[in-house]
């Protein structure tokens, strides 16, 4: 498989156009319709997601991405993390937790705000495995 980086979204934290039809942003111009920030990296046999924007389901479907090995979070803002629950189908498909990488602070906040994704809680099976980035790191396919 070819190595590839796909920008899935490059809009602001509100996306573009805004839900209110923000003035000065002509939504008839295709260049003004942008989903929130995230990216996908296809490297050798790995499928790596950078951030889980609120638009992640649509972004994956539009780009025909059907597999996922890991997620890297740049920081813990809603526009980077709100799509975290959309990772469940990849856990169900692969029957293994998805490793998520981020700084100590980002992982701490993700675990606090999305406890059900990291710990078994009544009605929810943990789907994610936290990986704190200290300096350099590498991602390997889980077998």
Q: How does the language model describe each region?
A:
Residues 1-143:
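Binuclear metal-dependent hydrolase catalytic cores
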């Amino acid at each position: 498989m070819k190595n590839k980086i796909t920008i899935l979204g490059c809009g602001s934290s509100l996306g573009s156009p805004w839900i209110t039809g923000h003035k000065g942003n002509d939504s008839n111009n295709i260049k003004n319709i942008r989903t929130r920030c995230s990216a996908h990296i296809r490297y050798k046999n790995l499928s790596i997601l950078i951030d889980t924007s609120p638009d992640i389901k649509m972004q994956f479907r539009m780009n025909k991405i059907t597999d996922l090995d890991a997620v890297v979070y740049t920081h813990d803002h809603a526009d980077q993390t709100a799509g975290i629950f959309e990772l469940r189908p990849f856990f169900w498909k692969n029957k293994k937790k998805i490793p998520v990488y981020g700084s100590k602070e980002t992982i701490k906040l993700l675990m606090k705000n999305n406890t059900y994704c990291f710990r078994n809680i009544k009605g929810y099976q943990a789907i994610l495995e936290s990986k704190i980035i200290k300096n350099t790191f590498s991602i390997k396919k889980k077998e």
